[in-house]
Every structure is written in structure tokens, then in C-alpha cells.
Amino acid sequence: MAMNYNAKDEVDGGPPCAPGGTAKTRRPDNTAFKQQRLPAWQPILTAGTVLPIFFIIGLIFIPIGIGIFVTSNNIREIEIDYTGTEPSSPCNKCLSPDVTPCFCTINFTLEKSFEGNVFMYYGLSNFYQNHRRYVKSRDDSQLNGDSSALLNPSKECEPYRRNEDKPIAPCGAIANSMFNDTLELFLIGNDSYPIPIALKKKGIAWWTDKNVKFRNPPGGDNLEERFKGTTKPVNWLKPVYMLDSDPDNNGFINEDFIVWMRTAALPTFRKLYRLIERKSDLHPTLPAGRYSLNVTYNYPVHYFDGRKRMILSTISWMGGKNPFLGIAYIAVGSISFLLGVVLLVINHKYRNSSNTADITI
């Protein structure tokens, strides 16, 4: 059956409008934006515009990469592994749970002097601080000194929320697993008498963490009284108000604790432990020679096949030792420059060729 079709009766597939009514339409407004008539600029890619970009990138990135790589190589750094899994290691005896506390000493030699300020780190391997449940296992309100959160921690801290019917301060898995080895450094002089190296334990945390994110509960001068009604984390040897004798570095504002609470993104990481400040421009901070590292071994890592190490490092304008960044700049610059040369040869070949059919745009 045939039927008459009248375009006036239909607008964009819609039903016919009622007599005297307004036709409904889905047509976009007649504006430059909705009709895609905005002014635009589309560059024409030619050899004269593209090739200089490749060469400029190469000429910029390669020198920068060389400078970063050389700067990184000039940074002094030494790592001392003291896990103790090897039978010959002085710390092997500390793997036994029966030896508590355990002390071990590792001797090492600095072949070259360390100039300027020296940073001492502790490093852990195969420790996944980036696990989702681990990262969430904390109460930031409690760490910020909130009195109600102190006695009623967040449920995110489970199963380290309460112990012995008391709230844990600080609660959570991050605080419960805090690194608690003690590291001491000694210079062995010519008379073989060890000279202790001064290690500064303040100034290792970020300013915002120390002064904004972490605060002790309000109250009087007695910090123990402020934490009354709470208990220490399960794995801690002492409560949080006994972390340091310095009142400006005790409790939640203890800088070792603050550094640990900033979780790492990768399973192998290092965290700042101490600062060794330069005292004289005439003498190196750590002269070349023999040293000993005295360890109070408290933190077990062999249960999860982890490793522990102590790192001494200087820094430069670009931070710590990082050869990868310089290599990456050199690689990108070299690839860009090489592509520029290849495209230049191709352009020269086809530009002088009479057979323009070989050129595809």
C-alpha cells in the first residue's frame, strides 16, 4: 500500500506537530560552536617545519642528559647490607628470636671522602607499603591530635585498633610496623679507637608533616598524661610518648615516626634516618678511611625474604644519585636526533626524484 509523504509533516523523524503548535526539533542551534564553525589553525607539516623540531629536541635533551648523568656520578654513595642472612655476616646471630636485644658491628671502608652534608638512610626491600589495606590502615585525625579520635580510632585501623581493651595510639598497620633498628656510625682512627660520628635526628621530616599533619593531643606539659587511656602498638617496644627525651621530638611529632608514616610507592625503598652536617669547609664531613656501623637489631625482615641496608649519600642540585634520569634524557635526545637525520635523508631523496608517485601523504 502506498502512502503520500510530505517533508513538511516531519521534523527530524518526529511526529507531526499539532495545528497551531510549535514543531519540535533536535537540530543544534545555529551557533559557531555547535555548528563547528569556530576558527581553527591546522599546521601544514612539511620537511621545513618538522625536521628542525627533531634536531632542536636532540640538541637540547642530549646536553641536559649528559649534565645530569655527570652530576649523578659525582654524588658519593655507599650501601651496607646488614640483613644477616649470610652465615659469615656479623648480624647472622640476630636472626634467632632468642637473642633479644641483639647487637652487631659491620666494618667498612670509604675509598673517597664525602664532602658537604651527608644523609644516612635505611633501606628495605620486598616490603610492600603500597598495599591498599596497608596504606589505609591509619587514622589521620588521631595523628593530628584529635582527642575523640585518640580514644576512638577509625575502623580503618583494624585489626590494630584496640589491644587489651584500650585504643592503640598510634593505630593501624603502618604505625605497628615502624622501623625500629638503631644505627650508630664510628670512624676508626689510626689508633684504632672508634670516634663517634654525630648524627642529627631532627630535620629529617617534611616541614608540612611536622607542623601541620602531625600533632600531639592537647593538654599539659606531661605527654604521658595526654595519652592516658591508650596503649602502645602491638609490635612496639615502648609507647609513643617515650620515643625521645626531647619534648619537641616526642609523641606523634617524632620525626622518625613521621618519616615512616609517609608510605613508599615501591617495594624497594629508602627513608631518611639521620643527617651528618658539615662542620668545617677545610675538612670533609666523612674523610676516607675505616668505619664501623653499630646496629641494634630489632626489625626482622627475613620472615618475608626482605633485606635491610644502611646508605650514606651526598646530594647535588638535582637531589640524590639517580643515573636513570640522565640516561633517559640522552636516549630521548639521541632517538630524536637520529629520526631527524633519517627523515632528512628521505626528504632529500624524494625531493630530487622525478617520480612523484612514490610520495604518499
Swiss-Prot record:
Tell me which residues are glycosylated: N107, N180, N190, N294
Q: Report what the Swiss-Prot or TrEMBL entry states about this protein's PTMs.
A: N-glycosylated. Contains high mannose-type oligosaccharides.
Q: Annotated Gene Ontology MF terms?
A: aminophospholipid flippase activity; structural molecule activity
Tell me where in this chain the PTM N-acetylalanine is found: A2
GO cellular component terms? apical plasma membrane; azurophil granule membrane; early endosome membrane; endoplasmic reticulum; Golgi apparatus; late endosome membrane; membrane; phospholipid-translocating ATPase complex
Regions of this protein lying in the Cytoplasmic compartment: 2-49, 347-361
The lineage's top-level taxon is Eukaryota
Q: Which InterPro entries match?
A: CDC50/LEM3_fam
Q: Which GO terms describe its biological process?
A: aminophospholipid transport; phospholipid translocation; positive regulation of neuron projection development; positive regulation of phospholipid translocation; positive regulation of protein exit from endoplasmic reticulum; protein localization to endosome; xenobiotic transmembrane transport
Residues on Exoplasmic loop side:
71-325
Q: What PANTHER family is this protein classified in?
A: CELL CYCLE CONTROL PROTEIN 50 (PTHR10926), CELL CYCLE CONTROL PROTEIN 50A (PTHR10926:SF17)
Oligomeric state and interaction partners are given as:
Component of various P4-ATPase flippase complexes which consists of a catalytic alpha subunit and an accessory beta subunit. Interacts with ATP8A1 to form a flippase complex; this complex forms an intermediate phosphoenzyme. The ATP8A2:TMEM30A flippase complex has been purified, and ATP8B1:TMEM30A and ATP8B2:TMEM30A flippase complexes have been shown to form intermediate phosphoenzymes in vitro. Interacts with alpha subunits ATP8A1, ATP8B1, ATP8B2, ATP8B4, ATP10A, ATP10B, ATP10D, ATP11A, ATP11B and ATP11C.
Functionally, this protein is described as follows:
Accessory component of a P4-ATPase flippase complex which catalyzes the hydrolysis of ATP coupled to the transport of aminophospholipids from the outer to the inner leaflet of various membranes and ensures the maintenance of asymmetric distribution of phospholipids. Phospholipid translocation also seems to be implicated in vesicle formation and in uptake of lipid signaling molecules. The beta subunit may assist in binding of the phospholipid substrate. Required for the proper folding, assembly and ER to Golgi exit of the ATP8A2:TMEM30A flippase complex.
Family stated for the protein in its record: Belongs to the CDC50/LEM3 family.
Protein name according to UniProt? Cell cycle control protein 50A
**What is the species listed in this Swiss-Prot or TrEMBL entry?**
Homo sapiens
* Gene expressing this chain: TMEM30A
